[in-house]
């Protein structure tokens, strides 16, 4: 472990794994296969060495937060509304954010102090395609201006104000759009994980969703590796989800390998890589914890901000 001269403590994977202590493994291989995303390699050892120690750390933070509320209630002489602990997870497209969010949701829900853990992706707060097309920014989908930032902030602010019932919009990856007639209901969770590309954004004036986070994670990797993962995922989707006639990207289903790779490379270079460098990568240093992945999608180093 080192971290001299930086606001972070830096751990090798082995050093981080040792911090698991006696935390029990509560997931088996079937659970992990169910949780992991498309083209994301995730083993039992990865969960044991990386995510169990992280769940232990988060459990300690959540317990401390709960104890602080108890102290405040004692001071005020009356109980206050229960407020969830909010964790943000950021990083590029195809870096594995969603898989990490689901793993943490499962692990954290198995701790006795906070059995209710909800997961919300910011995709639901994208403007509908019709709005993006009207504004001429459909090609900027996923960039900060394509999100209903105020709606997202209102949602998280409602959570942190202790409202007993909060609703979030629902996004369909098949339709590649927000579903106008569906809402996700969240009722009195102990923890809420919010996962999205730009959730650590905080430049300029005004409020940002990251202002409401109690803990934040940035999933980091070499951009060349992320591009490879994106292309591999595109090829897998071509052979699976894109085959559905109702899929927004059904037009890609009949591409051969060379055509699919060329199209995925174009999309990466023109959209996702630009978004990474312009809007996502610079938010890395705002995270409480950084998970650094290697080319095989496995976490090689962990950086924890000094508190």
Regions found by a protein language model. Give the residues of each.
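Short coil/loop residues immediately preceding or within conserved phosphate-binding loops
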Residues: 84
């Amino acid at each position: 472990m080192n971290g001299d001269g930086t606001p972070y403590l830096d751990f090798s994977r082995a050093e981080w794994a040792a911090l698991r202590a006696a935390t029990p493994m509560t997931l088996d291989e079937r659970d992990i296969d169910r949780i992991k995303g498309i083209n994301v390699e995730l083993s039992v050892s990865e969960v044991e060495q990386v995510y169990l120690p992280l769940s232990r750390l988060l459990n300690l933070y959540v317990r401390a937060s709960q104890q602080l509320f108890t102290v405040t209630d004692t001071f005020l002489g009356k109980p206050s509304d229960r407020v969830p602990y909010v964790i943000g997870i950021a990083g590029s497209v195809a870096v594995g954010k969603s898989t990490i969010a689901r793993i943490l949701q499962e692990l954290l829900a198995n701790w006795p102090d906070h059995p209710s853990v909800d997961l919300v992706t910011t995709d639901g707060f994208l403007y509908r395609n019709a709005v993006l097309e009207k504004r001429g920014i459909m090609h900027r989908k996923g960039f900060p201006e394509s999100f209903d930032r105020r709606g997202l902030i209102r949602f998280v602010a409602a959570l942190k104000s202790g409202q007993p019932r909060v609703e979030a919009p629902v996004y369909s990856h098949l339709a590649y759009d927000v579903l106008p007639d569906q809402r996700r209901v969240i009722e009195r969770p102990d923890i809420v994980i919010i996962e999205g590309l730009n959730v650590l954004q905080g430049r300029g004036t005004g409020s940002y969703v990251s202002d409401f986070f109690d803990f934040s994670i940035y999933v980091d990797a070499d951009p060349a590796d992320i591009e490879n993962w994106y292309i591999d995922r595109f090829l897998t989707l071509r052979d699976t989800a894109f085959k559905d006639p109702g899929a927004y990207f059904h037009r890609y289903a009949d591409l051969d390998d060379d055509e699919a790779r060329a199209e995925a490379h174009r999309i990466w270079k023109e959209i996702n890589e630009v978004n990474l460098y312009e809007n996502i990568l610079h938010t890395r240093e705002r995270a409480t914890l950084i998970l650094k992945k290697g080319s095989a999608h496995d976490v090689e180093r962990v950086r924890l901000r000094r508190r």
